[in-house]
Design a protein with these regions (language model features):
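Glycine/tyrosine- and acidic-biased, solvent-exposed loop/turn segments at the edges of beta-strands
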Residues: 1-178, 183-198
Length: 198
């Protein structure tokens, strides 16, 4: 495959698969590299890498003297076919330790929170807020931020509890046979003046 390379006056490089230089593509390394350490892997124009993160973003800030500081610590992102995706770990890792887990472009994690930051944890399944064993949004320092969701539907704490722990139906024993209140009402309605079967 023919490779087209663009290099600017600072030394930033971009690799393309087409002569018009519109489709970023490189098979043996990042298709975009900047002198400050930014690296993006592309396959046929889509962010994509199977053997590691597809995006390294330098962490930079301006210090109190107005000087731009660029750290080696980076925001790291995994992509597959242009979508944030990683199996077995977070798809995005921030320099401060915050993480987000994605599966084929959707926030998703089955064994813990899909979003972890300094203020809260959030549980997602297939892009929807969802947690069975507690609040789907959990405040780390402030429990008042806790929010309960099932399949992206907001519930109160009590509604969430009752959804997973429905009240048991009470039965009424008549002549050794147990009837729920609904069953007993149905029998009475069916009998309509006739004798009941017990």
């Amino acid at each position: 495959m023919t490779q087209y390379i663009w290099i600017d006056e600072k030394g930033n490089k971009a690799y393309f698969s087409d002569k018009e230089m519109t489709i970023r593509h490189r098979e043996d390394g990042p298709a975009l590299e900047t002198v400050d350490g930014l690296m993006h892997w592309y396959n046929n124009g889509l962010l994509h890498r199977t053997d590691g993160p597809a995006m390294y973003i330098p962490y930079e800030y301006i210090d109190s003297n107005g000087k731009l500081i660029v750290h080696k610590i980076r925001i790291i992102k995994w992509f597959l076919d242009g979508k944030l995706h990683r199996v077995g770990g977070p798809a995005v890792i921030y320099p401060n330790g915050d993480t987000t887990w994605y599966h084929h472009g959707l926030l998703h994690r089955t064994d813990g929170p899909a979003v972890v930051d300094k203020n809260c944890k959030s549980w997602y399944i297939h892009g929807k807020l969802h947690r069975e064993d507690g609040p789907a949004i959990e405040g780390i320092k402030d429990y008042k931020r806790d929010r309960w969701f099932i399949h992206d539907t907001h519930l109160t704490k009590r509604e969430h509890y009752e959804y997973y722990n429905p009240p048991k139906k009470q039965t009424i024993n008549i002549n050794g046979k147990g009837f729920t209140l609904e069953e007993l009402n149905a029998l009475i309605e069916t009998a309509k003046g006739n004798s009941l079967p017990f």
